[in-house]
């Protein structure tokens, strides 16, 4: 495979509602947050892991393909009327590590084209927080409602990055000889699906609505609102 180009996809990722991506911290603090967001261990600033973006976008595209399984799609799922879309998903996100590298279809698909990066706060958002003496996160109080008595119980605090926060979004797309433009189209559909769905935890409760602003693919501006992921 001959590498012909590496395209940068950039945008400002804006939170339309609060975002919670957990840190996995099992340490308990009396009076503290029950569910903390992931933070940079050095700066203690929250960020969006590239792995979270990659996993959610891939999952949405797999659902769109109609071939979704309990595990990520693999070589064995390339069949039927959606075979080419499954191939393109594997081209973008990669095949599993246990795939037979000598199998012809694995060689045809090649290496993963996408490279996701962690998203940090934009400089202007950091400046806004500093100038207004605002916290980078908020505590969202939630309860479980007793269906019989209608009383609230089991109170808990979930840490969120508040609506309005802005992040620098960037990924790279490796373009190899004979790669189809359909790969870029599929990626854009994945980004649009993410806008229509949610990122992180508690999406069914309104968390994690995001929007990609000032999106560019290489030197070309793209309006995701014009992308129909179901076409």
Residue ranges and their predicted role:
Residues 1-140, 154-231:
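RNA-binding basic/glycine-rich loop and surface signature characteristic of RAMP-family CRISPR effectors
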């Amino acid at each position: 495979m001959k590498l012909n180009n590496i395209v940068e996809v950039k945008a400002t990722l804006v939170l339309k509602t609060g975002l919670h991506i957990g840190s996995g911290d099992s340490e308990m603090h009396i009076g503290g947050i029950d569910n903390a967001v992931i933070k940079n261990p050095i700066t203690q600033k929250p960020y969006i892991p590239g792995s979270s973006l990659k996993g959610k976008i891939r999952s949405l595209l797999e659902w769109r393909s109609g071939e979704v399984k309990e595990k990520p799609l693999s070589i064995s799922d390339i069949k039927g009327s959606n075979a080419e879309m499954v191939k393109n998903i594997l081209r973008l996100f990669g095949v599993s590590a246990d795939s037979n590298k000598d199998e012809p279809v694995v060689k045809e698909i090649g290496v993963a084209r996408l490279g996701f990066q962690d998203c940090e706060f934009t400089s202007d958002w950091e400046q806004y927080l500093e100038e207004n003496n605002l916290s980078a996160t908020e505590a969202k109080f939630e309860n479980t409602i007793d269906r019989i008595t209608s009383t609230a119980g089991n109170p808990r605090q979930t840490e969120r990055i508040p609506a309005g926060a802005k992040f620098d979004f960037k990924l790279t797309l490796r373009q190899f000889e004979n790669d189809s433009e359909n790969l870029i189209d599929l990626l854009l559909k994945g980004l649009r699906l993410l806008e229509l769905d949610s990122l992180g935890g508690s999406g069914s409760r309104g968390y994690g609505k995001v929007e990609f602003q000032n999106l560019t693919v290489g030197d070309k501006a793209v309006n995701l609102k014009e992308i129909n992921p179901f076409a």
